């Protein structure tokens, strides 16, 4: 008793000292404030008593957001910002008198928060802040940013109630607030609670009867094991996780088209039923494509990052929505794994939490390197890349078998090409005869020729026909042609209204078909990503087909199923000149690789940059797509692309074979062979003669090539109907990330690089600066948030409400945990 009295006297003494300290700054506090101070706990805790008030009523003007900060005063950290007039740094204790004056003032011009803020402090809140100042105004890191402090429980602590550690913390809180625990639940209630908690379904009557008749602890544990091993357990847990991951069966936005992410959903169900560890569960969803020996299942998990809404409206700007998708991934990462509202920092520094706008875009850079363009790509069997082929085991076996056959056949072809020297030398021994054969053979495989020399007006005077240069070939249809001097005679020029379309069956090739295109073009200036021609669908449907662009006057040719992920692409290293005619030839060998694509400029092979290099499905037009038609080979205005305005086009030839270099040299200059004969320099071109012979005149090689192409077609038939799932996959070359002014995609500012908010935990420089490194950062033992967020979410899953009720927000604006010690102990 004597000790208690001494302790009480000591507290009274401290309390008096506290008020002497406060009153030294102000003559007298209002009586109502003093009364409220007397009702407060002996010690006011910054995180649990003071910070919620400051966050709600003060941080908007005196918090982390430097652009909105008033009076150069910060109340979210233990110092005032450096004064504009001197280098002095002031703490709250240094300005305590002014702060208390403003909190208690009745003068509207003096009072804080100001009346027009419409969030005033009540007397208890003012008293809390004043008492905290009197105690020394000590700041502490935000409760969720500090390392969990784990209480080591003794056997005596665990002896309460059922004997587990959770009950110790519950009992401690109930005793503190003077509440007795509820009576023990009946067996009927227990089994019902357990069944709903672990299966989401009521127990069966048989299970209820069996448990009522034997309600022992052993029987209860057996029920737990039974329910945890039930497939329903994974379904229940996945259902809750799907909400975290923003799962939906449609795209959202205006069109709201159907989509199928059920393979990812099934992966989540299996992960819970297999009791996958949480670090693996998260790492596979964030970066399953980047882990060592990534397989179909680990890549499938990354669909988590592609569950954002997807816009397929006609007028969207792709980069705008690509930026939206990156922001969505970043925001979801924050809410799902950090319990933070990162979206506030997309446009400005967070007003309540220490997350700057730069922090947001540094985090976003982890998700900004995905191989995507922002296009919807919603044609049948198409999806915006990156995507994963969802092959069955049987399909995998068939694909593997065909690929092995293709590899074997390719080796045979290489061997045969090397061994054909004897036949070639015999043919080469008579060069003039060989030249005649080349000239004659060049016309083989020519399936279309349009010289654009003759134009015949139709009834309305605006539409014209241009006759083909081959018998039996229908003429080209042209709207408002501009006719000028061409490569040979006349040429077709393009204005805003010019549209040229070939008959729909002309130039129709699949990705397994070899073909060549020869033509001349006259660029009239510099072109930024202008489409010269296209035998393809709209970019919204993946540029399905083939197309030619001028990108800063470099030639870019694309063959695609769904561009850019299911496509091959080449671009010349040099530009082609403007203001003059240039002869162009494009060849493709039908093998689905960028290495089989080549561009020739004025008869010479052009150095090119190859990309994409994965073309694994058919590029043929599907007539059942939505309401859009297919116009075949077209020149003129194209959807979503700049037009080849004022540009000329002439002498179009289409071949159903790969033209060899010597054939292309002859097509470019019909005097080529005459000069060879005159100058007798055949030997200089012997390799070109040999290539022609091997590709066209060696019957054994032709048979092997036909066998190879047949296998390729069979492989495409197997792969074509296989569904695909949107997943993650990074570009080989990192995409630059910038802070976006007010979050606007078209207003980049400072360039930033992959990093994490320093207020949470610095990013270890040893970690890879990609999504895998980000996942490893999440599970760093020093990370204060990861475990807390997941424990709180699991608690919510089973009890309906988390230990802190704002499961996705453990920041300053989030609810405080009801049982902070329990949350830390479980974490």
Model-derived features: positions:
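Extracellular glycan-associated modules
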Residues: 126, 406-721
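Active-site histidine-acidic residue metal-binding/catalytic motifs
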Residues: 26-31, 110-112, 253, 274, ...
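Solvent-exposed helix-loop boundary motif
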Residues: 25-167, 171-172, 188-193, 203-205, ...
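N-terminal secretory signal peptides that target proteins for export/translocation
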Residues: 1-7
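Extended surface/linker regions that mediate inter-domain or inter-protein docking
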Residues: 219-357, 363-364, 368, 517, ...
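Primarily short, surface-exposed interaction patches in extracytoplasmic proteins
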Residues: 157-193, 197-232, 246-293, 354, ...
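Extracellular/periplasmic catalytic domains that process cell-envelope and extracellular macromolecules
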Residues: 67-68, 91-95, 105, 122, ...
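Bacterial N-terminal signal peptides
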Residues: 13-22
């Amino acid at each position: 008793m004597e000790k208690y009295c001494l302790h009480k006297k000591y507290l009274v003494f401290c309390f008096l000292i506290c008020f002497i300290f406060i009153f030294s700054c102000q003559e007298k506090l209002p009586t109502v404030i003093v009364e409220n101070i007397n009702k407060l706990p002996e010690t006011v805790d910054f995180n649990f008593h003071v910070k919620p008030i400051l966050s709600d009523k003060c941080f908007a003007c005196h918090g982390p957001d430097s652009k909105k900060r008033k009076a150069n005063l910060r109340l979210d950290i233990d110092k005032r910002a450096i004064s504009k007039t001197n280098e002095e740094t002031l703490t709250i204790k240094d300005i305590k008198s002014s702060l208390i004056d403003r909190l208690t003032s009745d003068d509207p011009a003096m009072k804080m928060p100001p009346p027009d803020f419409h969030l005033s402090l009540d007397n208890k809140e003012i008293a809390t802040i004043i008492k905290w100042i009197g105690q020394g105004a000590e700041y502490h890191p935000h409760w969720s940013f500090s390392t969990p402090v784990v209480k080591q429980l003794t056997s005596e602590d665990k002896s309460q109630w059922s004997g587990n550690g959770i009950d110790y913390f519950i009992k401690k809180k109930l005793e503190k607030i003077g509440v007795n625990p509820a009576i023990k639940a009946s067996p009927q209630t227990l089994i019902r609670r357990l069944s709903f908690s672990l299966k989401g379904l009521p127990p069966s009557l048989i299970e209820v009867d069996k448990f009522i008749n034997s309600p022992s602890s052993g029987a209860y544990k057996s029920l737990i094991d039974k329910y945890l091993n039930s497939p329903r357990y994974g379904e229940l847990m996945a259902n809750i996780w799907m909400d975290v991951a923003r799962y939906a069966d449609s795209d959202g936005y205006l069109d709201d088209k159907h989509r199928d992410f059920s393979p990812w959903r099934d992966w989540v169900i299996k992960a819970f039923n297999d009791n996958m560890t949480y670090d693996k569960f998260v790492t596979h969803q964030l970066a399953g494509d980047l882990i060592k020996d990534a397989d179909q299942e680990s890549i499938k998990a990354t669909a988590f990052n592609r569950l954002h809404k997807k816009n397929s409206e006609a007028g969207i700007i792709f980069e705008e929505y690509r930026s939206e998708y990156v922001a969505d991934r970043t925001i979801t990462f924050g809410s799902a794994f950090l319990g933070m509202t990162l979206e506030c920092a997309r446009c400005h520094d967070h007003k309540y939490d220490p997350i700057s706008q730069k922090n947001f875009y540094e985090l976003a850079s982890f998700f900004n390197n995905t191989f995507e363009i922002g296009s919807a790509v919603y044609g049948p069997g198409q999806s915006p890349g990156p995507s994963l082929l969802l092959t069955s085991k049987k399909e995998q076996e068939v694909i593997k078998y065909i690929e092995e056959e293709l590899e074997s056949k390719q080796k045979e072809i290489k061997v045969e090409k090397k061994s054909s020297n004897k036949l070639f030398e015999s043919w080469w021994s008579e060069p003039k005869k060989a030249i005649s054969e080349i000239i004659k053979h060049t016309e083989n495989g020519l399936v279309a020729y349009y010289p654009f020399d003759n134009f015949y007006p139709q009834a309305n005077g605006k539409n014209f026909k241009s006759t083909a240069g081959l018998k039996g070939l229908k003429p080209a249809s042209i709207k408002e042609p501009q006719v000028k001097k061409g490569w040979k005679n006349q040429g077709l020029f393009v204005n805003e209204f010019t549209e040229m379309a070939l008959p729909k069956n002309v130039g129709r090739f699949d990705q397994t078909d070899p073909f060549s295109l020869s033509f001349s073009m006259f660029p009239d200036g510099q072109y930024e990503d202008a489409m010269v021609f296209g035998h393809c669908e709209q970019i919204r449907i993946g540029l399905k087909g083939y197309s030619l662009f001028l990108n800063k006057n470099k030639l870019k040719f694309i063959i695609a199923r769904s561009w850019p992920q299911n496509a091959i692409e080449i671009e010349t290293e040099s530009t082609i000149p403007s203001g003059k005619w240039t002869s162009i030839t494009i060849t493709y060998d039908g093998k689905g690789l960028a290495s089989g694509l080549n561009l020739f400029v004025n008869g010479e092979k052009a150095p090119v940059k190859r990309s994409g290099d994965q073309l694994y499905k058919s590029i043929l037009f599907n007539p059942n797509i939505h309401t859009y038609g297919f116009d075949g080979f077209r020149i003129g205005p194209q959807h979503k692309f700049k037009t080849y305005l004022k540009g000329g086009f002439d002498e179009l030839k289409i071949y159903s074979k790969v033209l060899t270099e010597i054939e292309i040299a002859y097509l470019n200059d019909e005097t080529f062979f005459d000069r060879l004969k005159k100058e007798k320099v055949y030997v200089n071109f012997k390799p070109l003669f040999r290539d022609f012979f091997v590709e066209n005149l060696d019957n054994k090689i032709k048979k092997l090539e036909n066998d190879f192409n047949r296998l390729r077609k069979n492989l495409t038939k197997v792969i074509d109907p296989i569904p695909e799932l949107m997943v993650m996959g990074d570009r080989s070359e990192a995409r630059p990330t910038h802070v976006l002014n007010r979050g606007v995609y078209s207003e980049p500012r400072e360039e930033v690089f992959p990093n994490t908010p320093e207020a949470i935990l610095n990013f270890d420089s040893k970690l890879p600066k990609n999504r895998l490194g980000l996942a490893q950062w999440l599970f760093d033992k020093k990370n204060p948030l990861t475990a807390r967020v997941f424990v709180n979410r699991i608690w919510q899953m089973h009890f309906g409400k988390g230990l802190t009720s704002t499961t996705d927000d453990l920041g300053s604006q989030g609810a405080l945990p009801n049982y902070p010690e329990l949350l830390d102990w479980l974490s």
